[in-house]
Amino acid sequence: MSQTQTPNRRLDLLGFFCPVPVHETRKALNEMQEGELLEVHADDPETLQDIQALCVRIGVQLLSITEESGEYRFLIRK
């Protein structure tokens, strides 16, 4: 990860299920400044759709989604 892609904040939402990951992601983004990066870790498969929908709904940029061993990593720019 390059320096420009280093997250300003990380959320560990492993073990949480809907609606907690979306709620906590929205809450974190509301507390962040424009242009900052948020990294979210989750393992609820519903987050694949829910986080993408949240990003579209609130107008933030979903930079990447990666999956490894059932854990998802979302990188979001506010």
Please provide the spans of the model-predicted regions.
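N-terminal pre-ligand scaffold of iron-sulfur
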Residues: 1-2, 36
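Right-handed parallel beta-helix/beta-solenoid
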Residues: 2-12
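Amphipathic, hydrophobic secondary-structure cores in small proteins
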Residues: 13-66
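Core SAM-dependent methyltransferase catalytic element
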Residues: 73-78
